Amino acid sequence: QNRVIDMLAKNVLDELVKAGFKGYNDENKSGDIRHILIRRGYHTGEIMIVIVVNNKNLLSNFRMRSVVNNLVEKNDNIKNIFLNLNSSNTNEILGKEVKQVYGMEKYITDYIGDFKYFISPKSFFQVNTQQAEVLYSTLKEGLKLKDNDVLFDLYSGVGSIGIFLSK
């Protein structure tokens, strides 16, 4: 786990608690905050925060605006912050509705090899970019693909394996 992310997660949690938000209780379906997602571009250092809330009213809540302002004030590398609504009785992390509450871009960027990826709040992307690069390089060496070979990269999120192997 990355120390920057650990510190930022604590900071986010502290700000939410200070603003009076309660953690979600799955047993009685009560509380405000279901999850906190923090993504950090390994090569770029760009940070995205996604706060998953249980109530639509929290998408435009004054206390939440205060939390966002305090986080941005204390952390220079935050590129964007999103609120995600998940009020469904489900074990899925993210809901369908996403609202951007800070930043101009709707994504952060990172690289695997020579390829640049644009990572949005709901994108599936490798969590450990450094290890993914090692794994993909090992895979490329083992496959020994030729220029006219065809590779299918099915059910693969953004397709980072196929993209890496295409060069």
Q: What residue spans do the PLM features occupy?
A:
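Accessory RNA-recognition modules of RNA-modification enzymes
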Residues: 1-167
